[in-house]
Regions:
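Non-catalytic signal-transmission and effector/linker regions of two-component phosphorelay proteins
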Residues: 2-65, 69-72, 80, 163-191
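Structural beta-sheet core signal
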Residues: 48, 129-131
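Acidic, metal-coordinating helix/loop segments flanking the phosphotransfer/catalytic sites
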Residues: 75-93, 100-102
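Alpha4 helix (beta4-alpha4-beta5 surface) of REC/receiver domains from two-component response regulators
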Residues: 107-111, 115, 134-157, 161
Length: 191
C-alpha cells in the first residue's frame, strides 16, 4: 500500500517546516521523490491563522498531528499572509485568530482577524471557519462571538493555552469536516 504524505506550508520563511518523505512512499510528486506542490494540497487544505500570543503554540503541534492524514496546513501570521494563501490555494477549513494583525508593520493598530472572517465569508464557496477568541472582557467576547456567528463561523473557541487544548481543537475540526463535507475528504476518499 502506498502512503501519501504532505508537508506543512507557511507563507513566513522563518516558520517553514520541511518534512522528509518516508522511504518507499508515494509523495504525490509523480514518483520523483519530491513532495507534491503545495498549491495542489492534500485531502484537506487547512488555513491556520495565529497571532503569536504563546511561546509553545498549539499551531505548531496541530499540523504534525494532521499531516499523516493528508491534511496540508497553511499557516499565516498576518491578515496579508492569510489573504495570499486564500487567493492561491483552495481552503477547505479555516482557523481564524481574531487577534491576527493586518500586517507586521502595525500589529497593534488594526486587527486582521475580523477582516479575514469577512473575506472568507465573501468567497464564492466560503470554507467553514473555527474562530479563536481574543480573550478580552466578557462584553467584548460576546460581541466577537456574535459577529463571528453572523459571518457564518462554525465554532468559536477560547485561545488554546496548553497541549491538552489540542484535543478540543481536533474534535471541533472533526465535527466541522463531518458536517460540512458529509464524511468525505474534500480532496480525496472518505475518512
Amino acid at each position: 500500500a502506498l502512503c501519501r504524505t504532505t508537508r506543512m506550508v507557511s507563507v513566513r520563511p522563518h516558520h517553514r517546516h520541511h518534512h522528509a518523505p518516508p522511504l518507499g512512499g508515494d509523495t504525490g510528486g509523480g514518483g520523483s521523490g519530491n513532495p507534491a506542490p503545495s498549491h495542489l494540497g492534500g485531502r484537506l487544505n487547512l488555513l491556520l491563522s495565529y497571532a503569536g500570543w504563546h511561546a509553545d503554540p498549539w499551531v505548531d503541534h496541530l499540523p504534525r498531528l494532521l499531516e499523516p492524514l493528508g491534511v496540508v496546513s497553511h499557516r499565516a501570521g498576518t491578515g496579508r499572509e492569510a489573504n495570499a494563501v486564500i487567493t492561491s490555494t483552495p481552503i477547505h477549513i479555516a482557523v481564524v485568530d481574531l487577534g491576527l494583525p493586518i500586517d507586521d508593520s502595525s500589529p497593534q493598530a488594526e486587527e486582521g482577524g475580523p477582516r479575514l472572517l469577512e473575506l472568507l465569508a465573501r468567497q464564492a464557496s466560503p470554507p467553514p471557519t473555527v474562530v479563536i477568541k481574543r480573550s478580552r472582557s466578557h462584553r467584548d467576547d460576546i460581541r466577537d462571538i456574535n459577529a463571528a456567528l453572523r459571518l457564518g463561523a462554525f465554532a468559536v473557541v477560547d485561545r488554546p493555552r496548553k497541549i491538552d487544548d489540542l484535543n478540543l481543537m481536533l474534535e471541533v475540526l472533526r465535527r466541522c469536516l463531518a458536517r460540512h463535507y458529509h464524511g468525505m475528504w474534500p480532496g480525496g476518499p472518505s475518512f
